[in-house]
Amino acid sequence: MILKFDLIQKFRGIYKHSSPNARLNLIMKLGSSSQITVNLLTPDNWLRLKNIRLRALIENPEAFGPTYDEESKLNEQGWRNRFKKEDYLIGSLENEDVGTMYIEVLKGDHGTTCWIGGCWTDPRYRGFGVMKSMFEFIDLHSKEKGWQRQGLGVWVHNQGAIKAYESIGFSVAGEKMASTSRPGSYFQHMVRDSK
C-alpha cells in the first residue's frame, strides 16, 4: 500500500543549527513538487526495514531500547519474523527512506488497540511532516487494521519527541515509569485516537 501526502509547511523547522548553505541545499532538494510517500511494508521488504532501522540505531541510539550491536546481528529470517506480529511503515521523500515506525495490534494499557514503537525520522528531515504523514496513514487505515487507539512509550528526557507527539494528537497517560532495560531511565506512556 502506498499513500502520498503533499509536504505542508516544508520549510518550517529547517535544521535550526545548519549553515545558510546547508539550508539552501535542503530547500532546493525539497522543491515545490516534493511529497512524502508512506509505505506499509511486507516481509519481502525486510532489507529496506533493516537499512532504516540500523540507520536509526546509529544516529539516535539514545531513543531506543535495543542496540545497533543486537539488531545488526539479525539474519534475513530474523528480520522477516518481525512481520509476524507487527506492521512496519516507512516514510520516504524523493525516493529516500527518512522515517519509520511499527504498529502492533494488541489490547494495551489505557484502552489502546495498538502499540506504536521504533519511531524515528532522519534528523535532516525533522519538522517536515514525515511522522505526521505516517500517522495520517494510520488514521486512514485504523478501522480495517485495528489501529483506532494508539499508545506508545517515550523517554521522559526526550522532550523533542514528546512535543512532536503532542502536536499530532497524543496526550500523556499515567505516570512516568522506570525502565527495566535502562536502569535510571524513565519513560512515559502517551495515547492518541484516530480521527
Where are these predicted regions, by residue range?
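Conserved N-terminal entry element of GNAT/NAT acetyltransferase domains
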Residues: 7-44, 51, 55, 193-195
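Conserved Rossmann-like nucleotide-binding pocket used by diverse enzymes
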Residues: 37, 115-117, 150
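Acetyl-CoA-dependent GNAT
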Residues: 43-51, 55-124, 135-137, 141, ...
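Conserved glycine-rich acetyl-CoA-binding loop
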Residues: 109, 118, 122-136, 143-145, ...
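C-terminal "cap" of GNAT-fold acetyltransferases
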Residues: 148, 155-162, 167-168, 174-195
